[in-house]
Amino acid sequence: AAGVMGNDQRLVDKILEAGQVSGEKAWQLPLWEEYQSYLHSNFADIANIAPGRAAGTIEGGCFLSRFTEDYKWAHVDIAGVADIGDGKNKGSTGKPVGLLFEYVNSNR
């Protein structure tokens, strides 16, 4: 399933619904405040990911949230669904193209 996170629940819900309609699974991930502290950096204003942590997708969402405070936004993280992933072949699954098409088509 593609990870979905954002600062507007209505928008996130529409994306999750588009996933259900299109048959491309999506799952909402939390952007809890405690994850924000992982972006602390001794070398820059903000780190884009914390070393050695297992919540990289969520940390990526937290990173995006720092630059989108004035906007409603949602992020569809495709890292887990985009590659064929069989270890033998190169290429992409095409996911979440169907989800995104369904979202755009149903929200015109």
Sequence positions of predicted segments:
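A generic structural signal for tightly packed, nonpolar segments enriched in small/aliphatic residues
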Residues: 1-108
